């Protein structure tokens, strides 16, 4: 969190402790302290393809959805719902999911599971609600049916007479059961759906008519009872009245640290009523706007930005203790793993006070338990070549134990993820460290279609600087099998950089999710002299699209123009690594076992 600075009119002491050279640095150091915590983590082998988890307050059990090796080319033949003891992390039961015909016409005659991605518990009716992004379905099962053979739906939204893209609920993600109002809320592409938990009547709500929305996560405000949903496509947060099913407020989430990168990719949302704040995890682009946006709960204005991680995903908050837990998925499409950590953040100070190294990569979901501990699901696949019996042969649809998943002759080793539980104890307050970081003032420009460009406002001859921007698409391309209501992918444009009208660089923009952007380097000519001003222009060079451009003016100096910001951070401390509980094996699919006695040993 940025620290307060000394007034420019304050009288400065002759000397400053700790080697600080200015009144601002001395004042910042005096104000720097942080909440000290002791972090413990426990871990056990989990399931292949873990997605989300839900806690039952009635049975005190955790239910985990698992669907492995699901791709656009084929459905999954390794999937289950597991019941887990949240104290020991042992898997007590695994379900036999319903087997259906492959929904892809080119794989007619083959089979897949009706899978489970999103999940929540309805203790009032003794049911489990799950979403299936592979078949665009929401399905309800009985909790006590996990160990009674193949699961049979109590109800499903899936209509076999309709194609995938004609299903009523589009690409469902999270499910939240509001027992007080007897409704289940499901997020997905195009809005959210409200389903009566007794009659299963479905109502669609479009929070942003005229544009395609994609709410993903759902969190309940413990004070008002309203729901908060984060929109991944539109970078907005919706506050929803669960009684009237209406959006009572829409809050835009602005850029956190790179202002000309207006796209932040909203993911998780949590609130703290006592602090009057909303916390939004944002994935950003290549480290830009990657972290947690802190919004004023009353006005919706950005108060603070906490930088963290490579690709932050899910988060939960322990409001009683004002502790935020934030997972880092890491880079999704790189050979080298990244992410795999969970940050412990003091919400009062906006400071990361601890970090758990959960897995090699891919933290996907967090669940807060009543005792304040947090269960973490990763998708790293760190347990290699496991054998499971919740697997079917894609050609026959028959259950068969296997450590390999086969589709169209291609074999994929079945790797399992981990279940991790984090517990945090307060240990008082300690002096922190004042960290200084450079803030480089930027010159920014915008083209006629809203594409942006930004670079340092002051440059030095011979210096290499970064130029970046958002937008710059050369049209769109649409998949022929997708309905027109689905978003088209933008085509990255060919771009050129001009310095005072002369072309100095040509390159192609990049594609990420539904957007296009660019990051490139520019070497400042040695012929430029301090005191001069020069114009840098980025323009499209794609022959098939109308020309457009954006320009900025930069000033040349002998030295870079940098501002220094001070922030209080926790003292450097090593990551917490989980202790490992011996794996007791998977119970037979459709069956169960009693809790085994296990010992906990250090990893």
Give the ranges of each region predicted by the language model.
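Predominantly soluble domains enriched in secretory-pathway, periplasmic, or organellar proteins
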Residues: 3-448, 462, 466, 496, ...
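Extracytoplasmic/secretory-pathway segments with low complexity and glycosylation-like composition
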Residues: 41-43, 344, 426-603
